[in-house]
């Protein structure tokens, strides 16, 4: 079936007015045989005047052209030779969709082995940020020549890159010989280059651009998958090219080289352009070969461990179609070219679009047309029949605006075919169809990458830069314009800037090396800083041992006065036994908020605890005012609660959870040793808090209270859990502050008379280390946080593990890293200077496994910190290191406690339960798991269960009050 009379007439006489529509048939997608396809009207077809600037040989595109006389070729032949390569936007969008699917398959662990588009991870994780500096060598091997460059990068005053380079030949006998010959040649050229510049003794870092498909597991290793283009050196496929090059250099023995990074030329192009434009996240080569790379989210790359950040993916899109997915658009000429190539059946997409094959495709078409007497009056010369005689540079010359037809005549004459003017115009038409198809296909595949980037970012419109290189894109007079135009139509929701790589991919290899060097140096400094937070098992065992020693000091009468871990007797001698009964008030004071509770405890067959509570806040001026103001405020809130519950009247028993270090001389007397957690109220330290509360009640003269028990929140937590689980003999709080308590044998509690039974000891372990025994593991950041705290020099262990201080440690590390230029572009913002900005909840959110980096960035943005993807990763790392140390230290402390209980009882193995409360333990995604693991590792002879206190320490205070009432035999609530 031919093109039809309307088109033939138009070709003979030229089009009518610009903008007219001619009913021209259209090739449909998915059909195997162009000659047997259905035809549909087409809006505007290109005329024969194809060298006119601004022509657009493409379906669905209006074209304004001048009339020109066309040789009367038959409609059948024109259809067969030219029209089969014409692709509509509909087909191009279909190809875009196919390539998007191929990309997904290549990234998937399950589908990658059979995927034709390999989507190779490059281990390039960052584009240049402008702070790179140094002196580098770059090798660029992969095209028609081999380049060596010396690249000096200086960023002190302005981003400045100076380069000197030399080009070396890669003769056919070398690229088709053995691998050792090839790399000996590279090593020889490198030696020559260094000799001329007198830098043989320098051992400069080397970046190696190796423009072939390689599998990498790190940045300085590249295992060749397959040769492409004209290379076929034996013994290299399946081998690490870095090792081969190092071996060749070593064999020479006259210089040494440090190969830091191997990159694909496409990655090199992206990095070269990325130095000038940090929006550049795609690299594109359209030259001898073709390929593209782009920055992919690590969470989508199954073949690489980790899910944080991005990594450059080398698509190796030249192999698109090797699985048969492009058979419907490949022509007989594509198949013939493939059969005669060095690698039949491979790189099929590349063979349809790249400069290495374009001239050959045109030659095959011309041969067939000549054989059919459609060109050159049927003359076929030996030159025309010789592969490689018609090059892509010939195609470019023939398609130039003004001299195209004349160039065609000269080129065809060189081939001995004696062309007529009409032959030259026809050949120009063939060249245009072939090169236009190439531009369209590359636009479709690049469109798929842009769509993927847009989807990854979750933005309706993408703004990005594509770094581009390659002789076809640069030298062909019409290629880039056609390519851009098609791309705009295929992906209208992307704003793309094309940045031409002026200095090739060699500079890119140097930039990758510079970035790798910068990142390695940054990584070294970051690791050095964070290593002080990473505690070995041996260090944790030492912490456990030291705490055990401090516990013994606190329990003994003779050493208690100088002990930092005070081991305070709580006078709680029994856990609940289930017979407790009555209505009790509880007061829970331990932070900026406090609770008043009514707790109704019922015993019998069905034990129940019913609670009513109200939360009140304590303003900062009262926290740091006088003691009378603080306790008057508390009593005012109790009065409000009694009115609220309608129970003001009878004298009710009250348990007072007071979460600060107190020395108790009885259950209902607690003398405040020191304020913690930001409290500073005067005239309280050294006084009995129960008496201070009773005095405030008297001053109010509204109601009376029976203060039965003063309880630490940790003891309250233990009692709450012990009511549910009788094996609970330890209490732990890890929230704003941190503390632990446990049931100690009375014989070991020298501060209280009597040797029978047990008593709960409030350890007050927050002060562990106040005597300097933990200085070997305290970091400079711990010291800064301590120095600026309200109670400098005190509660040092607590300041390393509790929620009130972890955020401050993180903030100080971030300030240090920002000063060093590792974070936030080196800019210390006002929010970062603000103490207390990093609350525990932010640490918990940032470390959540479920959060993608975009969400981490959003959290940082809420805090006024504008972060890049890399910033977010580092912030998350810092949070993780600080919270892990906290969990491990907490675990080491708990291991000391459970071991003491086991030894007290002379058991080979102890089963015990810990009642736990506190926001850090409850809300942090990893804290509890790490702490449990640490306890298990450090106390293997103990099986420790952890029970979360659901009702807080207020319920515990009521239970202790109930136990106290029961033990004193009070008839009102017996």
UniProtKB/Swiss-Prot annotation:
CDD domains: ASKHA_NBD_HK1_meta_rpt2. Residues 72-514, 520-962 form the Hexokinase domain. GO terms for molecular function: ATP binding; D-glucose binding; fructokinase activity; glucokinase activity; glucosamine kinase activity; hexokinase activity; mannokinase activity; peptidoglycan binding. Residues 577-711 are annotated as: Hexokinase small subdomain 2. ATP 1 binds at residues 86, 140-145, 481-482. Residues 129-263 are annotated as: Hexokinase small subdomain 1. GO terms for cellular component: cilium; cytosol; membrane raft; mitochondrial outer membrane; mitochondrion; sperm principal piece. Coiled coil: none annotated. It is found in: Mitochondrion outer membrane; Cytoplasm, Cytosol. Hexokinase is an allosteric enzyme inhibited by its product D-glucose 6-phosphate. Hexokinase activity is inhibited by N-acetyl-D-glucosamine. It is an enzyme of class 2 (transferase). Residues 1-42 are annotated as: Disordered. Residues 712-951 are annotated as: Hexokinase large subdomain 2. In rapidly growing tumor cells exhibiting high glucose catabolic rates, isoform HK1 is markedly elevated. Isoform HK1-SA, isoform HK1-SB and isoform HK1-SC are found only in spermatogenic cells. Isoform HK1-SC is detected in round spermatids, condensing spermatids and mature sperm where it is found in the head membranes, mitochondria of the midpiece and the fibrous sheath of the flagellum. Expressed within the principal piece and midpiece of sperm tail (at protein level). D-glucose 6-phosphate 1 binds at residues 140-147, 265, 288, 469-471, 505. D-glucose 6-phosphate 2 binds at residues 588-592, 713, 736, 917-919, 953. The modification Phosphoserine is found at residue 393. GO terms for biological process: canonical glycolysis; carbohydrate phosphorylation; establishment of protein localization to mitochondrion; fructose 6-phosphate metabolic process; GDP-mannose biosynthetic process from mannose; glucose 6-phosphate metabolic process; glycolytic process; inflammatory response. Catalyzes the phosphorylation of various hexoses, such as D-glucose, D-glucosamine, D-fructose, D-mannose and 2-deoxy-D-glucose, to hexose 6-phosphate (D-glucose 6-phosphate, D-glucosamine 6-phosphate, D-fructose 6-phosphate, D-mannose 6-phosphate and 2-deoxy-D-glucose 6-phosphate, respectively). Does not phosphorylate N-acetyl-D-glucosamine. Mediates the initial step of glycolysis by catalyzing phosphorylation of D-glucose to D-glucose 6-phosphate. Involved in innate immunity and inflammation by acting as a pattern recognition receptor for bacterial peptidoglycan. The N- and C-terminal halves of this hexokinase contain a hexokinase domain. The catalytic activity is associated with the C-terminus while regulatory function is associated with the N-terminus. Each domain can bind a single D-glucose and D-glucose 6-phosphate molecule. This is Hexokinase-1.
């Amino acid at each position: 079936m031919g093109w039809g009379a309307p088109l033939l007439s138009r070709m003979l006489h030229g089009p009518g007015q610009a903008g007219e529509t001619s009913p021209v048939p259209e090739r449909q997608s998915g059909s195997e045989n162009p000659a047997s396809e259905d035809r549909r009207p087409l809006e505007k077809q290109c005329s024969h005047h194809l060298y006119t600037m601004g022509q657009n040989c493409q379906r669905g595109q209006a074209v304004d052209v001048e009339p020109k006389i066309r040789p009367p070729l038959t409609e059948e032949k024109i259809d067969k030779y030219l029209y089969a390569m014409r692709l509509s936007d509909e087909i191009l969008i279909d190809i875009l969709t196919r390539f998007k699917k191929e990309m997904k398959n290549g990234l998937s662990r399950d589908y990658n082995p059979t995927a034709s588009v390999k989507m190779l991870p490059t281990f390039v994780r960052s584009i240049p940020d402008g702070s790179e500096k140094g002196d580098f060598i770059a090798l660029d091997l992969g095209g028609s020549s081999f380049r060596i460059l010396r690249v000096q990068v200086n960023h002190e005053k302005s981003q400045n890159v100076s380069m000197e380079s030399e080009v070396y030949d890669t003769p056919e006998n070398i690229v088709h010989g053995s691998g050792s010959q090839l790399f000996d040649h590279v090593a020889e050229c490198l030696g020559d280059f260094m000799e001329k510049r007198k830098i043989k003794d320098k051992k400069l870092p080397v970046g190696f651009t190796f423009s072939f498909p390689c599998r990498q597991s790190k940045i300085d290793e590249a295992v060749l998958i397959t040769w492409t283009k004209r290379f076929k050196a034996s013994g290299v496929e399946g081998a690490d090219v870095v090792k081969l090059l190092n071996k060749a250099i070593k064999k020479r023995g006259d210089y040494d080289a440090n190969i830091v990074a191997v990159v694909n030329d496409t990655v090199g192009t992206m990095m070269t352009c990325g130095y000038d434009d940090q929006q550049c996240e795609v690299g594109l080569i359209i030259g001898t070969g073709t390929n593209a790379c782009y920055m992919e989210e690590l969470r989508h790359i199954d073949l690489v461990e980790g899910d944080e950040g991005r990594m450059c993916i080398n698509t190796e899109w030249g192999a698109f179609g090797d699985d048969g997915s492009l058979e419907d658009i490949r022509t007989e000429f594509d198949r013939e070219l493939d059969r005669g190539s060095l690698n039949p059946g491979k790189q099929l997409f590349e063979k349809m679009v790249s400069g290495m094959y374009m001239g050959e495709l045109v030659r095959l078409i011309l041969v067939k047309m000549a054989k059919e007497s459609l060109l050159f009056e049927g003359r076929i010369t030996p030159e025309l029949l010789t592969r490689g005689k018609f090059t892509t540079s010939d195609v470019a010359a023939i398609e130039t605006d003004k001299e195209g037809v004349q160039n065609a005549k000269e080129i065809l004459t060189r081939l001995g075919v004696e062309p007529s003017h009409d032959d030259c115009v026809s050949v120009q038409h063939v060249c245009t169809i072939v090169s236009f198809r190439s531009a369209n296909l590359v636009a479709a595949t690049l469109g798929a990458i842009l769509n993927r980037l847009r989807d990854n970012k979750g933005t309706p419109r993408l703004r990005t830069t594509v770094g581009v290189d390659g002789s076809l894109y640069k030298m062909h007079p019409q290629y880039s314009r056609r390519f851009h135009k098609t791309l705009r139509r295929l992906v209208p929701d992307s704003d793309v800037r094309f940045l031409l790589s002026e200095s090739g991919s060699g500079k890119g290899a140097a930039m990758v090396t510079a970035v790798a060097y910068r990142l390695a140096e940054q990584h070294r400094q970051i690791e050095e800083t964070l290593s002080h937070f990473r505690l070995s098992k041996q260090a944790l065992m030492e912490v456990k041992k030291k705490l055990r020693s401090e516990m013994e000091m606190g329990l003994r009468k003779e050493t208690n006065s100088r002990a930092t871990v005070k081991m305070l007797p709580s006078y709680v001698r029994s856990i609940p036994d289930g017979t407790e009964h009555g209505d009790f008030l509880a007061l829970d004071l331990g932070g900026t908020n406090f609770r008043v509770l009514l707790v109704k405890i019922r015993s019998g067959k069905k034990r129940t605890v019913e609670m009513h509570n109200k939360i009140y806040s304590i303003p900062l001026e009262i926290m740091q005012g006088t003691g009378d103001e603080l306790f008057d405020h508390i009593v005012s809130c109790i009065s409000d609660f009694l009115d609220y519950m309608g129970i003001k009247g009878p004298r009710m028993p009250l348990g007072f959870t007071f979460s600060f270090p107190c020395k108790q001389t009885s259950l209902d007397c607690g003398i405040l040793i020191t304020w913690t957690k930001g409290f500073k109220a005067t005239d309280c330290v050294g006084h009995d808090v129960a008496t201070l509360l009773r005095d405030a009640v008297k001053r109010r003269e509204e109601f009376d209270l029976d203060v039965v028990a003063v309880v630490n929140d940790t003891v309250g937590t233990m009692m709450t859990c012990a009511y549910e689980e009788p094996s609970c003999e330890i209490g732990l709080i890890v929230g704003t502050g941190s503390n632990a308590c446990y049931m100690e044998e009375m014989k070991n509690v020298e501060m209280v008379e009597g040797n029978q039974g047990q008593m709960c000891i409030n350890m007050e372990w927050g002060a562990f280390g106040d005597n300097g025994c933990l200085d070997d593991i305290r970091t400079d950041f711990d010291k800064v946080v301590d120095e600026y705290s309200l109670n400098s020099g005190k509660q040092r262990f607590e300041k390393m593990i509790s929620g009130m201080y972890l955020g401050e440690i993180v903030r100080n590390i971030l300030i240090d890293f920002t000063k060093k230029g590792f974070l936030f572009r080196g800019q210390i913002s006002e929010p970062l200077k603000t103490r207390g900005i990093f609350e525990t909840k932010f640490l918990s959110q940032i470390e959540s496994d479920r959060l993608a980096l975009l969400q981490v960035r959003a959290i940082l943005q809420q805090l006024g910190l504008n972060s890049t993807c890399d910033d977010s990763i580092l912030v998350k790392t810092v949070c993780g290191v600080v919270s892990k140390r906290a969990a491990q230290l907490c675990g080491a402390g708990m291991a000391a406690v459970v071991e003491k209980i086991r030894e007290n009882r002379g058991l080979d193995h102890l089963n015990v339960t810990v009642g736990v409360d506190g926001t850090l333990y409850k809300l942090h995604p990893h804290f509890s798991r790490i702490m449990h693991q640490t306890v298990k590792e450090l106390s293997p002879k103990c099986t420790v269960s952890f029970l979360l206190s659901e009702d807080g320490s207020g319920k515990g205070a009521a239970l202790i009050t109930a136990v106290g009432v029961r033990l004193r035999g009070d008839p009102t609530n017996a």
